[in-house]
Amino acid sequence: MNTQTRETTSMSDAQDKAGTLIEALPWIQRFAGTTMVIKYGGNAMVNDELRRAFAEDVVFLHHVGIHPVVVHGGGPQINAMLSRLGIESEFKGGLRVTTPEAMDVVRMVLTGQVGRELVGLINSHGPYAVGMSGEDGGLLRAVRTGTVVDGEEVDLGLVGEVVGVNPEGIVDILAAGRIPVISTVAPEIADDGSTTGQVLNVNADTAAAAVASALGASKLVILTDVEGLYANWPDKSSLISSLTASELREMLPRLESGMIPKMAACLQAVDDGVERAHIVDGRLPHSMLLETFTTAGIGTQVVPDEETNA
């Protein structure tokens, strides 16, 4: 007779796990078959435990019938490479100033390092992820843009604003049962609609919003390094769990500069028909699952004006 030593779990622990699965069931049913666009960035990109947890979350979403689309930046990695090469980084209004020299580094890091590493992490669970950039298949189109700081126009160099998304490539990848992983560089478009031959650095938050809108996504989730949006930063008791598009539009000019692109992206997505947009703390392992599959959720959600409840 063979005997086996089995790892035992207390009945209460087992019941807790069962309760978690049951709580997730209505949310799995609600979002199965829909597309979820996730902007991957912040500390979740540089901490090994968080990187692995993020990849697991994406694969879990895939296996329960949700179609995840990952749009990533690479701020920490870009900063590290620019520093290594002796190229100074400058930010204005929360956006990177990109010189031609810096653009070469941005393109190299986003498409050749960050994207490939993320694809590899996801594919450690199976052959699911396919890497692409905004240049591939005419996915993204952008025009050069600046920003306004203290009421004055500021030139951001080779920084673009997405003005068009061709979602066919993403749709084809999803139809093949794969997970698109998109690097946010994009070809520049001239006034006549032709390409100029220049590649632009596109803010990943706003690019993710544009992709979510083009795909008719059920959710846009932006991972960041704070718990969510605060009504009175730095008072952490003022965390806002949910607000409408109109409420966010009124708050936007008063926000900290680093939060403006993220919250503007949420507002853009909801205004363009995405059902809801979320700011989620990427420093928390499995934060996407907590947001998507628990009744309380985490972080801050933005909903259309006609909807006030999650």
From Swiss-Prot:
What coarse category fits the chief subcellular location reported for this protein?
Answer: cytoplasm
InterPro entries reported for this sequence: AceGlu_kinase-like_sf, AcgluKinase_fam, ArgB, Asp/Glu/Uridylate_kinase, Glu/AcGlu_kinase, NAGK-C
- Pathway listed: Amino-acid biosynthesis; L-arginine biosynthesis; N(2)-acetyl-L-ornithine from L-glutamate: step 2/4
Binding sites annotated in the UniProt record for substrate: 74-75, 96, 201
Describe the reaction catalysed, as an equation. N-acetyl-L-glutamate + ATP = N-acetyl-L-glutamyl 5-phosphate + ADP
Question: One Pfam family of this protein, by short name?
Answer: AA_kinase
Coiled-coil regions listed in the entry: none
Top-tier EC class: transferase
Q: Signal sequence span per UniProt?
A: none
Biological process GO terms, please? arginine biosynthetic process via ornithine; L-arginine biosynthetic process
Q: Does the keyword Kinase apply?
A: yes
**Any single GO CC term annotated in Swiss-Prot or TrEMBL for this entry:** cytoplasm
Which CDD domains does the record cross-reference, listed alphabetically?
A: AAK_NAGK-C
| Intracellular or extracellular location(s) | Cytoplasm
- A GO molecular-function term, please? ATP binding
What is the name of the protein in this document? Answer: Acetylglutamate kinase
The species is: Arthrobacter sp. (strain FB24)
Q: What is the lineage of its organism?
A: Bacteria, Bacillati, Actinomycetota, Actinomycetes, Micrococcales
